[in-house]
Amino acid sequence: MASMKIGLIDVDGHNFPNLALMRISAYHKANGDEVEWWWSDLVHYDIVYMSKIFSDAYTKDVPEPINADKVIKGGTGYCITLGADGKEHFDKSKNLSLPEDVERCFPDYSIYPQFNFAVSMTSRGCPRGCSFCHVAAKEGRCAVKVANVSDFWNGQKEIRILDPNITACKEKRDLMRQYKETGAILDFTQGLDIRLLNDDDIADINEMRLRTLHFAWDNPKDDLETKFRNFANGFRRKSNIGMVYCLTNFDSTMEENLYRIYTLRDMGYKPYVMVYDKPHAPKEIKQLQRWCNNKIIFNSCKRFEDYIQ
């Protein structure tokens, strides 16, 4: 069978390695195909793969190539629509999963030479089912182990972990052990679920080489102050404990936003304001994000009320 010419398009840009495209590249190269980033309709391609992670609110789609026998579009971003209620909705019928033989390919890191870290996703799914998040709709409400660390890592000094809720996975002890044994600097990019962390988890985390830890306090109706305080007491760092994402512009009042921000700061965490549907967010929410996320301003002006005067 003659080899094919394959084009790849990372619709979101090249700011972070796209795991699906790296696997697709590895699969086609293993089959003797030529793989490159699509760059012009002057070039004919047998197949062009377009991958999009984010919704149109953050990443606009790009035109489909016209000089290709087949164009395959996939990724969460192609499954999200914005409803009349102003909220995103995930259409599972549009979800295009990678074939099993592609899913099992070791990622082709060579297509992103600007990055020197590994990217892993060793578990999928999340039991939370948060209305602003698409993980449960896409992957299910049970966190399950889907791979080993060695399926992604071959000695890189850093690993960016994409598991949506590794702390909810029944096999988390095994996965935590695998990550520790790499000796690599670890970054749980999707955050750790503070509600599920136990003493064994904290002990494992204390033995890891870490970038900044990430957590979330998205729903102000959840009283998580005790959980955050327990982790702070057990974690080896006593300052700069971790970054905590605080969702705003999604069923929360300004009073609730500020309570989370002030409480987290007082315990040694770094709150980070996330704005839902930012293009349509009110001015005050955008000011809150600017104040909180600029640490020079945040550390010099302790109260948001003073910042907006």
What name fits each language-model region?
Residues D69-P107:
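Ser/Thr/Gly-rich flexible loops in soluble cytosolic domains mediating phosphotransfer, phosphorylation
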Residues M1-S3, S40-D46, P65-N67, P113, ...:
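Flexible, charged surface loops at secondary-structure boundaries
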Residues E207, T212-H214, K221-Q309:
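A structural motif corresponding to the C-terminal lobe/cap of the Radical SAM core domain
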Residues L19-A20, Y112-D151:
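Canonical Radical SAM [4Fe-4S] cluster-binding loop centered on the CxxxCxxC motif
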Residues N18, D46-V48, K60, I80-L96, ...:
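Short, charged, surface-exposed secondary-structure boundary motifs
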Residues I66-G74, A184, K238-N240, Y269:
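A short helix->loop->beta-strand "cap" motif at the edges of active sites that frequently abuts
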Residues M1-K73, Y78-I80:
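A short, structured N-terminal alpha-helical element that caps or precedes a catalytic domain
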Residues L8, G13, Y49-I53, H134-F231, ...:
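Core AdoMet radical
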